[in-house]
């Protein structure tokens, strides 16, 4: 089927449908009245969302306000079209997790087609000969292997089993720099690594405790001694240079202030110390190293005992979504 403006309009309406519950629907909020429709205040026609099909190959988008970064925003997959017949065949218009994404059912319009998926084993894609720029696609296919252990992944690369890997253990960086200088590359990466507090339960329902934990983190030591991959200490939630944004540093390392804030909370609650805090992260050697490093900082500065709890990815996502955590790993990637 040809990709038309109707496919985009249908896809935008679907992702904004409040019954679908898409996590990235807000990416389309720059469209006029999109938030009103998504939040259930008005029906699609009544809301007059700023999406209009002028003809099969002309789509008109009207914005709520001027958005200087709008063209860059369109690179996000939330703006990509979905195949309407496939969506409707599998009842996926208002449902997430139906069979429409299985290899035998999925229909896309990118340079590759999903050809196989063995859970926890491999994802395979093959070249899409119907792609508009197929002549520029040099690869016949790609296999993606989900490997949790970074050393296993590195060994698979060095043996020739993998052609490319993005995960390297911090403990191996110096060795790889020396032995494989032409293979190891550090590339700019737009993202922020952070921890999420559960604000609905003690002790993080109190701002003083949250600030104390934040001030007790030595970000310089974390990136220099633990991560070692050229990361920058995060002093704001949004990384510098995002869409020309120059953030004002908000986070700093101040152990004395951290101790005072926590002591104020403990005195008010009549406590000698905080009960053990459970820190949840999805299974990964890298996440474990960061968690252990922060555990040490919080124990040394605040006298807090941290219990580390790792979970399989889907279980982790479900637990966080349900609010079943005290402190959890998180990330934001642009």
Segments from the language model and where they lie:
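Second-shell loop/turn segments in exported
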Residues: 1, 47-49, 100-102, 143, ...
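Aromatic- and charge-enriched surface segment that lines or borders ligand/interaction sites
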Residues: 1-25, 60-62, 153-156, 203-205
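Short, well-ordered beta-strand elements
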Residues: 8, 59-60, 110-113, 123-124, ...
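Gly/Pro-rich hinge or "lid" segments in bacterial periplasmic/extracellular proteins
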Residues: 30-52, 56-58, 62-141, 149-151, ...
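Short, hydrophobic alpha-helical packing/hinge segments within bilobed ligand-binding/sensory domains
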Residues: 103, 153-154, 173, 209, ...
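Extracellular/periplasmic solute-recognition and catalytic clefts
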Residues: 115-126, 143-201, 220, 224, ...
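Append "and occasionally in soluble cytosolic enzymes with long acidic Gly/Pro-rich linkers
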Residues: 126-127, 185, 205-300, 307
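Periplasmic binding protein-like
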Residues: 163-164, 299-334
